[in-house]
Amino acid sequence: MATMLNKRVTGAFGKQAPVRSARVAAVRPSRSSVRVAATAAPQEVEGFKVMRDGIKVASDETLLTPRFYTTDFDEMERLFSLELNKNMDMEEFEAMLNEFKLDYNQRHFVRNETFKEAAEKIQGPTRKIFIEFLERSCTAEFSGFLLYKELGRRLKATNPVVAEIFTLMSRDEARHAGFLNKAMSDFNLALDLGFLTKNRKYTFFKPKFIFYATYLSEKIGYWRYISIYRHLQRNPDNQLYPLFEYFENWCQDENRHGDFFTAVLKARPEMVNDWAAKLWSRFFCLSVYITMYLNDHQRDAFYSSLGLNTTQFNQHVIIETNKSTERIFPAVPDVENPEFFRRMDLLVKYNAQLVNIGSMNLPSPIKAIMKAPILERMVAEVFQVFIMTPKESGSYDLDANKTALVY
């Protein structure tokens, strides 16, 4: 949930050398001086609220913003325990671990002097939407870092191979989040990721649902990044900022992470081989697709600044992600049915109406009354999309004792 779960910041504090005690005359500032110092700090930078100099207040959490995730770590330990799951096929995990250790992108995320210069040329409304894009992307990557890091720590004793893979994936996510946060500083802002860690709400998902959500997040992240990269290679005049030049190698991290979760689901076939799995697979696909579709159309100006058609871009990403997903999920939405995107476009229309009402200078109760019938129509459309005839899928033969790929 690439996109949505989470890429990284670490802090190291050196041990202080012993210092002899000394008597120092403490000077207590007057109340007036404290008041002056407090008001001297800017309350806004680039049109965004700041919590302190250069540090942006995180955007409000909504249904469409990136989330931080947590899970039942004890159940995770049981699912991957080699002692409890003696028949677990570790060959594919071991091969993946060796690939993660190669760290293909170790030297990829190196900035150059063009970043700051390019950021200074981006002005007006485009500048603000670039900052919003960087914040959402950084938050999503950092979310993944936090989850993967904790899984790596918790699984060390029960399954060292899988634990190390999670740790190495958290390494990737940390690089991505750090790179994006540094990009924000080109626009005179940054996120306090340590503050977010402690203060942001965490959404709980059972392990099975974590696997669904993170698989989709990583795969949709891959298709988003590679699609933007290829578009800008064909249209270099729209390359407003050098960040996008890194997307070709960057997206391979996302793809490898998604492939790891494919291996996880193959190792736990009970998660993808019954009627409940079919319903949950479709639910998570729709949740991810609808969230992206509404989010991106709400920020159409960003994609337009890159020369992209937001609708065409989103539909391409969803179709390609769905093709990848149907290889392992037992059922997926039929996104190539024209009715699917017709209803998605209706959701975009209704969401725009909600945003418009939200911006009105009216009392909250009045806004709630105005929003109610629109929300009702949105729920009805989502339900209609969910009950559309799905594509029965899953090209892997998932046997309880042996997993084999069907050609």
Curated annotation (Swiss-Prot):
The keyword Oxidoreductase applies. It catalyses: Mg-protoporphyrin IX 13-monomethyl ester + 3 NADPH + 3 O2 + 2 H(+) = 3,8-divinyl protochlorophyllide a + 3 NADP(+) + 5 H2O. SUPFAM superfamilies: Ferritin-like (SSF47240). Induction: By Copper and oxygen. Keywords: Chlorophyll biosynthesis, Chloroplast, Iron, Metal-binding, NADP, Oxidoreductase, Photosynthesis, Plastid, Transit peptide. Catalyzes the formation of the isocyclic ring in chlorophyll biosynthesis. Mediates the cyclase reaction, which results in the formation of divinylprotochlorophyllide (Pchlide) characteristic of all chlorophylls from magnesium-protoporphyrin IX 13-monomethyl ester (MgPMME). GO terms for biological process: chlorophyll biosynthetic process; photosynthesis. It is an enzyme of class 1 (oxidoreductase). Its EC number is 1.14.13.81. Coiled coil: none annotated. It is found in: Plastid, Chloroplast. Its cofactor is Fe cation. The keyword rRNA processing does not apply. Pathway: Porphyrin-containing compound metabolism; chlorophyll biosynthesis. GO terms for molecular function: magnesium-protoporphyrin IX monomethyl ester (oxidative) cyclase activity; metal ion binding. This is Magnesium-protoporphyrin IX monomethyl ester [oxidative] cyclase 2, chloroplastic. The lineage of its organism: Eukaryota, Viridiplantae, Chlorophyta, core chlorophytes, Chlorophyceae. Its main location: plastid. It holds the Pfam family Rubrerythrin. GO terms for cellular component: chloroplast. PANTHER family: MAGNESIUM-PROTOPORPHYRIN IX MONOMETHYL ESTER [OXIDATIVE] CYCLASE, CHLOROPLASTIC. Belongs to the AcsF family. It comes from Chlamydomonas reinhardtii. It comes from the Eukaryota.
